[in-house]
């Protein structure tokens, strides 16, 4: 065990609610600092997959999810400190509102809780469109609600004019006693959204231009030097964790990971955990015609409904995956991966044939079918968990499955929805397909068990 007292310049960019401009400010700040020569390590509070993709493109470093519902305090500190190595400053993007939590009463799962675990100063982004004095009341409420949160300033977004900006700035600084660190005009830039949130970074061909444009806006309208000063004054962190050695035998196990514009929802920490014990081989579901020589397969979530026609057309790979599953090789699929392993996927464009291994069809709906954190209990041993093991994760999808035959389930739903409101995790041969997204740092035995199952098939 090692005690690591570390001075890590860090700041949380939080929001008064969703869609107030947190992502724009965060990635603009990241990109601007990179352009100035800083090595920026990005983080995302919460379970989101899409924002970290933008973080990666803005900084060149993989973003890490810090979620206090799924992860313990020690796990959050471990991934935060371990992945900061080699960086100059940490920019931590929040989620929803600063104090929004998993149960709306405690601070569990909130940005505020994570900021306190990290002893990180907070800069709040607020939408002040059509507000002046009321903005001060809102900001004062955030300041007083939890004195242990290190609220160091606010960025006022979507102001209508210079006159409006002056009024709101004066009100917030005089009446709320919070320093204004930026005033951003409305309609400067608009981030593209889809039903799960932002459109993925994979789908933007103009990403460099977009990121540089956002960085210019941040540079012009935000006091970046002051934010850096706030980050540099963050108190030291003490964290205790073990330095784990990679398995020297990992070269004998290969895990295929389908990672492309279709299936891009992977926690980087999950891939890192697997890579401690196995070699990862990446597969493209649209362009690769054959599976590489691997011992197991991991299919994450994403947007198969957007690329359903392309998935259907790649019949050779679908057949390869079917045969791989049928042969009893370990296959773990989450959400979009579950949909892909089913028989078909129905969208507004029609019904498309999928791999056809699992006995279900899925259909897309305009409204979400499940959203939020999930807690499961394992009903029977599977490739990622032993019997009666607690599994924590989250769900967010607009699809609904229909079973087409008898299904064996791995998990009982204690919180969440799963496949039918009571169960999740269809088991067939050595394949597990579920709606829940699991962070492997919530229980490190998950990755180890999956790799051991792959080793047994060799």
Curated annotation (Swiss-Prot):
UniProt KW keywords: ATP-binding, Cobalamin biosynthesis, Glutamine amidotransferase, Ligase, Magnesium, Nucleotide-binding
Annotated site (Increases nucleophilicity of active site Cys): 437
EC number assigned by the record: 6.3.5.11
SUPFAM superfamilies associated with the record: Class I glutamine amidotransferase-like (SSF52317), P-loop containing nucleoside triphosphate hydrolases (SSF52540)
Catalytic activity, as annotated: cob(II)yrinate + 2 L-glutamine + 2 ATP + 2 H2O = cob(II)yrinate a,c diamide + 2 L-glutamate + 2 ADP + 2 phosphate + 2 H(+)
Cystine connections: none
Catalytic site: 335 (nucleophile)
Boundaries of every GATase cobBQ-type domain copy: 254-445
Entry annotated with the keyword Mitochondrion: no
Database matches in Pfam families: CbiA (PF01656), GATase_3 (PF07685)
Role: Catalyzes the ATP-dependent amidation of the two carboxylate groups at positions a and c of cobyrinate, using either L-glutamine or ammonia as the nitrogen source.
Note: The a and c carboxylates of cobyrinate are activated for nucleophilic attack via formation of a phosphorylated intermediate by ATP. CbiA catalyzes first the amidation of the c-carboxylate, and then that of the a-carboxylate.
UniProt domain comment: Comprises of two domains. The C-terminal domain contains the binding site for glutamine and catalyzes the hydrolysis of this substrate to glutamate and ammonia. The N-terminal domain is anticipated to bind ATP and cobyrinate and catalyzes the ultimate synthesis of the diamide product. The ammonia produced via the glutaminase domain is probably translocated to the adjacent domain via a molecular tunnel, where it reacts with an activated intermediate.
UniProt name for this protein: Cobyrinate a,c-diamide synthase
Organism: Archaeoglobus fulgidus (strain ATCC 49558 / DSM 4304 / JCM 9628 / NBRC 100126 / VC-16)
Organism placement in taxonomy: Archaea, Methanobacteriati, Methanobacteriota, Archaeoglobi, Archaeoglobales
Gene designation per UniProt: cbiA
């Amino acid at each position: 065990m090692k005690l690591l007292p570390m001075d890590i310049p860090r700041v949380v960019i939080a929001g008064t609610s969703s869609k107030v401009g947190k992502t724009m400010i965060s990635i603009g700040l990241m990109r601007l600092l990179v352009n100035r020569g800083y090595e920026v390590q990005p983080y995302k509070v919460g379970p989101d997959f899409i924002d970290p993709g933008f973080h990666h493109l803005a900084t060149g470093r993989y973003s890490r999810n810090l979620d206090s519902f799924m992860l313990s305090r020690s796990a959050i500190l471990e991934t935060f400190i371990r992945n900061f190595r080699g960086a100059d400053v940490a920019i931590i993007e929040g989620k929803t509102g600063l104090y929004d939590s998993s149960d709306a009463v405690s601070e569990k799962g909130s940005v505020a809780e994570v900021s306190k675990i990290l002893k990180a100063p907070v800069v709040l982004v607020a939408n002040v469109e059509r507000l002046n004095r009321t903005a001060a009341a809102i900001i004062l409420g955030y300041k007083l609600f939890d004195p242990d949160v290190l609220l160091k300033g606010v960025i006022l977004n979507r102001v209508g004019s210079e006159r409006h900006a002056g009024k709101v700035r004066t009100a917030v600084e005089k009446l709320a006693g919070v320093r204004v660190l930026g005033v951003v005009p409305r309609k400067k830039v608009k981030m593209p959204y889809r039903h799960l949130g932002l459109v993925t970074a994979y789908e933007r061909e103009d990403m460099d231009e977009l990121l540089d444009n956002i960085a210019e806006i941040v540079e012009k309208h935000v006091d970046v030097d002051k934010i850096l000063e706030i980050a540099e004054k963050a108190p030291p962190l003490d964290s205790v964790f073990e330095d784990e050695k990679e398995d020297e035998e990992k070269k004998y196990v290969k895990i295929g990971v389908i990672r492309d514009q279709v299936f891009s929802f992977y926690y980087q920490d999950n891939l890192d955990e697997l890579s401690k014990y196995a070699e990862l081989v990446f597969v493209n579901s649209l362009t690769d015609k054959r599976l590489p020589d691997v011992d197991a397969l991991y299919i994450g979530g994403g947007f198969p409904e957007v690329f359903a026609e392309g998935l259907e057309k790649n019949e050779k790979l679908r057949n390869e995956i079917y045969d791989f599953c049928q042969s009893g090789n370990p296959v773990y699929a989450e959400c979009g991966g579950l949909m892909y392993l089913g028989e078909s996927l129905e969208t507004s464009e029609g019904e498309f044939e999928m791999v056809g291994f699992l006995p279900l069809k899925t259909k897309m709906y305009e409204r979400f079918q499940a959203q939020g954190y999930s807690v499961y209990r394992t009903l029977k041993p599977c490739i990622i968990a032993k019997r009666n093991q607690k599994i924590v994760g989250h769900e967010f999808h607009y699809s609904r499955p229909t079973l087409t035959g008898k299904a064996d389930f791995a998990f009982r739903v204690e919180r969440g929805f799963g496949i039918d409101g009571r169960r999740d995790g269809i088991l067939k041969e050595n394949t597990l397909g579920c709606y829940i997204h699991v962070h492997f740092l919530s229980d490190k035995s998950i990755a180890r068990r999956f790799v051991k199952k792959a080793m047994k098939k060799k």
